[in-house]
A protein has these predicted regions:
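HIT superfamily nucleotide-processing domains
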Residues: 1-92
Length: 92
């Protein structure tokens, strides 16, 4: 499979991992657009959020809270963004 996220999760491409569990993998963006810019991706391959099942959606949502607390932004605030498709600015 030629998916950059799958390769990062498999360790084929190095990353700065900040969190991992059974369902998700979180790592720092290589071109951050904010002081804390972390990508949280499901370990199961999917093209975008529209392919996400309920279990994975819960796991990603729980990881958002864990990473926000870990990175020290849970009180000050943060954004959660999902880009879907060309018109939604999805680049991967």
């Amino acid at each position: 499979m030629d998916c950059i996220f799958c390769k990062i999760i498999a360790g084929e491409i190095p990353s700065d991992k900040v969190y991992e569990d059974e369902h998700v993998f979180a790592f720092r963006d290589i071109n951050p657009q904010a002081p804390v810019h972390v990508l949280i991706v499901p370990k199961k391959h999917m093209r975008n959020i529209l392919e996400c099942d309920a279990q994975t959606a819960v796991a990603v949502t729980e990881a958002v809270g864990k990473v926000a607390r870990q990175e020290g932004v849970s009180v000050s605030g943060f954004r959660v963004v999902t880009n879907c498709g060309r018109d939604g600015a999805q680049s991967v």
